Amino acid sequence: MADLSSPDGDPTIRTLLRHVLDTADSHTPRRRQSTQTNPQRRRSQTPYSKRQGSQRKTSTRKHSHGTGSVGRLARVQGHGHLEEQTPRTLLQNILLTAPESSTVMPNPVVKPAQVPEVARPSRRGSSRGSLELQLPELDPPSTLAPGLKAPGKRKQKLRLSVFQQEVNQQLPLPQEQRGAADGSSLASSFNLSFVPSVQPQTVDRPGLARRRPVRRPVNIGAFLQNLENKSLTSALPGDSHRTPVAALPTDVVFEDTQPFSQPLAGCSLSVHHSLPNPSQTEVEDAERVVGPRTPSTGTRPQSQMSRAGFGASPLPFSEPQPQSPELREAVGSKEAEEPKDLEGSSGDEETSGMPASRELSSSAQDLLLAEEPHQLFEPPPSPGVAAVSSESVPAKLPSRTRTAQPRHHQDPYKAGLSHYVKLFSFHTKMPVEKAALEMVEKCLDEYFQRLCNDLEVFAAHAGRKTVKPKDLELLMRRQGLVTDQVSLHVLVERYLPLEYRQQLIPCAFRGNSVFPAQ
């Protein structure tokens, strides 16, 4: 006890426990009692309790292996049961696991702070189960190579923050940082990176990188050229009096969007011919012939205004070109023939005093649309300006007129025959073949033809143009259907159904609301 009170001594737990072990008795006083009670316990044990005890022994033996300190404890436990441990064995276990530093006088040397490793607690039961002591089991320092893993050691997990930092730096993860990354949650919370991760310029896996969409620049010149080419191809192939769109300014072509619109004040989109326009009275006669049937009558005042106001203005963007004499003669002959035809048709209409028929109006409309599409909507040329090229641009193409097709009217005679054939198939009350129905239709056709001819002959012989019932009765007498014994009324009652007889018999005797008695 003298060295304990000296100030130079190291009063640690280890020294105190060693002093107790040196002075204490090597045998416990309860050892003898426990040995005496063991036979009694063995007698009271059942096979089930023995089986549980053996299972407990095997589990404790498996748990004791793994480290050096645990191996020492296993040697102590191998001599007896857990219930037979003495205070000496407990103190020896404490000596094996207690730290070397003193709790009263700490070491003056300051060591760098290290991250404490997580200890796995192990519970060991006392002799009676009343004492529970939790002792931490520290893993011994591994002296293995850095590439090899220690037996029974958990796989180290990589922190997300460390991974983000390594991705930003584009550096491989060092071994030192991997060991430090597996620290406590408090130490790893300070390693969080609040700076957004910068995407590296070079990607190791190019297959995961998204491709940028290919944006092709729009070529406005090529777009306008395609529009001009389409307008050239959409023009009529046989029309020689139209100008291509490429010869006109773009703003003039885009501004002229209304159908049959009036030309602009600065330029003229019309065609200049070498011959003068027909007189005003001839055009009015042509309008009177066509009337409201032509769809272009509403634009006639515009064409007249364009002839009056803009006829003398030449084309500012086109140069005069010479024209062949054959073309001039052909155009002149066409223009000379049109007023004559229109004047003749209008004269016939005035002399007759009746509105023009449908055939005359349709023929005049076709004539105007076929031979004068450019004169109805274009101003006349100035006398001092030469004609332009044969191709020119109209203000708007006229709408295509639809020719009225004759309706297919069904012959009422054929419709009546088909009706009687249906009646025949209905009254037979059995299926009839198609060939038999065709034969019935032929017989009905022949019968009705002869009946009509006979009735017409009887009515003409009597000097009448209307067939009367007495003509039918006379014909039926000639055929032998009506005699002096069998009158027409008896024949009706014999062969006609009841619903028809209810309508015909009152009409024959005293009349009804539809056919009153004469």
UniProtKB/Swiss-Prot annotation:
Post-translational modification comment from the UniProt entry: Dynamically phosphorylated during the cell cycle. Phosphorylated during G2 phase, metaphase and anaphase, but not during telophase or G1 phase.
Major localisation: nucleus
Keywords: Cell cycle, Cell division, Centromere, Chromosome, DNA-binding, Kinetochore, Mitosis, Nucleus, Phosphoprotein
InterPro entries: CENP-T (IPR028255), CENP-T/H4_C (IPR035425), CENP-T_N (IPR032373), Histone-fold (IPR009072)
Gene Ontology molecular-function annotations: DNA binding; protein heterodimerization activity
Gene3D superfamilies in the cross-refs: Histone, subunit A
Modified residues (Phosphothreonine): 86
GO cellular component term of the entry, any: chromosome, centromeric region
Family per record: Belongs to the CENP-T/CNN1 family.
UniProt name for this protein: Centromere protein T
Organism: Rattus norvegicus
Taxonomy of the source species: Eukaryota, Metazoa, Chordata, Craniata, Vertebrata
